Amino acid sequence: MALAGAPVAARSPRAVQVWLYAVAALIVLMVVVGGATRLTESGLSITEWKPITGALPPLSEADWQAEFDRYKTIPQYEILNKGMGLEAFKTIYWWEWGHRLLGRVIGLAFFLPFLYFALTGALRGTLLARCFGLFLLGGLQGAVGWWMVASGLTEHTSVSQYRLAVHLTLACIILTAIVAVARSLSPLAAQALPARVRLTARVLVGLVLLQIFAGGLVAGLDAGMSFNTWPLMDGHLVPAAGQLGAMQPLWRNLFENAMTVQFVHRSIAYLIFALAFLHLLDCLRLGGTAARRATLVFALVAAQAMLGILTLVHMVPLDLALAHQLGATLVLIAAMIHASDSNRRQIVA
């Protein structure tokens, strides 16, 4: 039952939409901070998962030393950071702590308004169910994050590229879902689009998510630190089959062979660029809002491709790598809005 006397504005779709877009912006920030945490090799600095008490950082020198001593027990310290001092440890600790704190902030930024909007009647029916589903996905993402970190605490000096890719992709799936729900609360556009345009818009979203997963594998394998030329890769447009399929069974190359993983990432980028361009031409013939949306999508895809090339040839500097990661979320948001507006039906609350 809705709260009696709740302000009308609090029950309006516009208020819900602003809330969802704000959470989406926080998720974009989370993806960038997560990228910085990975690139600074800070992700394993906190070796325990304490969802409640872990919100507080060490408050005394004794607390800091205890955290540092726990870090000294994992392979990353023994193999890569032996001899690291406490001050250097604090630097990587703050990155990971900030990443986890932001996750908690996002959880509260979603859950508290969710309760309020549900109690005031702004969320009902299908919209309520969808928002509750988003909350469950957020909880799953927290568990997946720890599952990823745990893979680097016992036998390896870094996290599993499989789990990193899943963690990143799930964050982006949540982002697309939030944007889709928020966009569905806007008035419907009058423009009717051919089925091929609606389908291509959806396919672009799927390809961008697939590319983000491939990018997670590239990051997890540090595959961007090798084959730092473009358009050639190891002197060829297409590397030798023997190199791309060096591992047995062959499927492992798609996930564990740095050359193959990078080649797949490049190939999906070419596919997205070509499809976005052809889709743009199709939408320009139709005109209207679809043409404007498709233009934005293609412009962001082109900018993201350029950022990817620069990141590669400069061997993954922090600023370019983070810009590339941010660019991926912007492409995804633009593609999702375009697909949503091209295909959606109004939610009946």
From Swiss-Prot:
It is a multi-pass membrane protein. GO terms for cellular component: plasma membrane. Its EC number is 1.17.99.9. It comes from the Bacteria. The chain crosses the membrane at residues 15-35, 101-121, 132-152, 162-182, 203-223, 268-288, 296-316, 317-337. Its main location: membrane. Keywords: Cell membrane, Heme biosynthesis, Iron, Membrane, Metal-binding, Oxidoreductase, Transmembrane, Transmembrane helix. It is found in: Cell membrane. Signal peptide: none annotated. Belongs to the COX15/CtaA family. Type 2 subfamily. Catalyzes the conversion of heme O to heme A by two successive hydroxylations of the methyl group at C8. The first hydroxylation forms heme I, the second hydroxylation results in an unstable dihydroxymethyl group, which spontaneously dehydrates, resulting in the formyl group of heme A. Interacts with CtaB. This is Heme A synthase. It comes from Azorhizobium caulinodans (strain ATCC 43989 / DSM 5975 / JCM 20966 / LMG 6465 / NBRC 14845 / NCIMB 13405 / ORS 571).
